[in-house]
Amino acid sequence: MNLPHIKDDAMPAKENRIIYSHIGLEGWNASIEKYLSDGGYAVLAETVKRPREELCAEVEKSKIKGRGGAGFPTGTKWKFLDRKSGKPIYLICNADESEPGTCKDRLLIYQDPHKIIEGIMCACYAINAAQAFIYIRGEYINGYRILQKAIAEARERGFVGKNICGSDYCCDITVSRGAGCYVCGEETGLISSLAGGRAYPRIKPPYFPAVKGLYDCPTAVNNVETVCWIPEIFKRGGEAVSKIGCPADPGTHVWGVSGLVQKPGRYEITTGECTLGELLHDLCGGPLPGRRFKAIIPGGSSMKILRWDEKFTVKNAD
C-alpha cells in the first residue's frame, strides 16, 4: 500500500477542531460555568425562536452525514420522521461506543458534555421531540455520572426540561447505560435494549426508527458527534457547512489512531484534506523509533487489514 510521507514543500496536514474545539484546552473543565463562558447555549437560545421547518431545511442543506459509521444524511433521516402519526417523537443520542479501540465520543462525554447536551436540545426542538435519551456504553461509568451531573446543571439553568430558554418548548433528557452489548451500535438493536428488551436488531421494514422506533413511536437516532454538529449548522448556516471539506461528505471527521505511533490520539480533520499517510506521519509523528509500519486496520477490528506494501484505490469520496 502506498502511503507516502507528505512532500517537504507542501503544507503539513493540520487539524480543524470544530467539534473538538474545547478538547485539551488548558484550564477547561466539564462544568456549565466554563461552557457558558465560551458562549455555550447561545445557539439553543436563538434556536427556540426559529421555525422548525427552517431549521430542518438547514440540516438538509448542510449535507452532514451521520458520524456513527453508516454515513446516512442527517437531514434526510429527520425528513423521514412520521409527524402525522399523533404519537410523540423521540430522539436518541447513540453514545454506545462499542467498536474495539474506538473512543472518539468518550472525549466529548468526559470533557465537553454540555456541547452534547446543547446539540441534543437543538435537534429535539427542530424535530419537535417530546423526550431525548442518551444511550451510553455501560463501561463508561464515570461518563454516565458526568452526563447526569451536566444535565442537572442544564436543567437548573433552564436549558433542559420545562420552558427551555424561556420558550413554551419542554423536553427532558434521560441517560441509560448499556450492558456491554456490541450489537447495540445498530440503531434498532439499541432501541430494543432501551425499551427494556433483548438487544436484537429488528427487521426493516416495518421497523424503520423514523416511523416505528422507541415504543413504536417515530424516533431519530443520532451519534454523539452528529448531534454536536447541529448547533454549528444552526449558527453557520447549512450552505456554509456544506462547503467545509469534501462536497460529498462535508464537515470534519474525528479519527482515532492507536498502536506503535509516536503520538496516538484523536484527530479532527476536514474531509478530503488529509491522506492516511499524512495522518500517520505528520499528525501522529510516524512509527516509534526503530519500528516500521507493517499493516493498518483502517476502521476498527471489523475491517480488513491493509498491508503496508499493498496498493489500493479509493473508489469514491466516502
Language-model region placement:
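Short amphipathic, charge-patterned alpha-helical segments
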Residues: 119-123, 272-289
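Gly-rich Lys/Arg/Thr-decorated short loops/hinges at beta-loop-alpha junctions or inter-strand turns
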Residues: 35-41, 93-105, 211-214, 255-262
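Short coil/turn connectors at secondary-structure junctions
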Residues: 15, 53, 61, 85-89, ...
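Hydrophobic alpha-helical positions that pack around
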Residues: 144-271, 283-286
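Iron-sulfur (Fe-S) cluster-binding modules
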Residues: 1-62, 129-134, 278, 290-291
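Small-residue-enriched alpha-helical segments and adjacent helix-cap loops
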Residues: 54, 65, 133, 137-183, ...
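Histidine-anchored nucleotide/phosphate-binding helix
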Residues: 112-126
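Conserved phosphate/anionic-ligand binding catalytic regions in large, soluble enzymes, centered on
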Residues: 61-81, 180-192, 196
